[in-house]
Amino acid sequence: TYADLKLPCSSVVKKAFEELDVKVQAAYKEGYEGMASLDQELLFQWTGRMVYGLLYYEMLYERDRLLRQGEDFELSADLRERFGRFHLMLQSLIEPISFIGKKPWTIAVFPLKYSADIFSYRDDAINLMFSFGVNGFGFIACLQDNGVIGEKQKEILDKMEGHVLHPIQFEELYARFHYSDYILQYKPKYKIETQDHGIVVEAETAGKQPLFGFWDEDIFAQL
């Protein structure tokens, strides 16, 4: 179960995440208003911790599976770069790392109408995506898209503002984010500099613009 998942970490990291959990728990008790008031960097760190943990276990599972078959486990250069940047950004929890300009993520928080016994959770660790919904609120996070998917879905996000989502609407919205990520032909790039006060991460917006492939309604309907 998820409760059994544990990751190796230093005492400094453990303490930092415990302090983060206290902040999120306090916001959680206030429902949508509390979660929506949280700084998005805190939500990035909180969701990122879970996605990173799942990614860690997925990599261990795949490594062990291949070793049993006498094969080597290797990540592609693109995945090594993606996960390396993600790990660097997560260290903003304990290190002086700041994000300037456009944020590396898209995070949408909204009121959600679920019955008290329903809990919705989805993740795509490889693509660094996450969704979470309970009675009162839900949120969807794309943790390394440079805000591109949020811009793609801006029209529908604007229409949602001020409305409480039905569970089916929540599932459809996550499907929209997930499919947008699938057809996105874009590799996020960053300017990362070490300065006197710490590390600065800036999303590069010049150069090749994001391009989305053909939106196939039949495939979208299956998500």
For each feature predicted by the language model, list its residue ranges.
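Short, Lys/Arg-enriched charge-dense amphipathic segments
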Residues: 41-53, 61-65, 84-93, 195-197
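Short flanking/linker segments adjacent to small metal-binding domains or redox-active Cys/His motifs
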Residues: 16-19, 47-82
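C-terminal, charged low-complexity interaction regions
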Residues: 70-223
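An N-terminal structural lobe/cap that precedes and organizes the functional/catalytic core
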Residues: 1-29
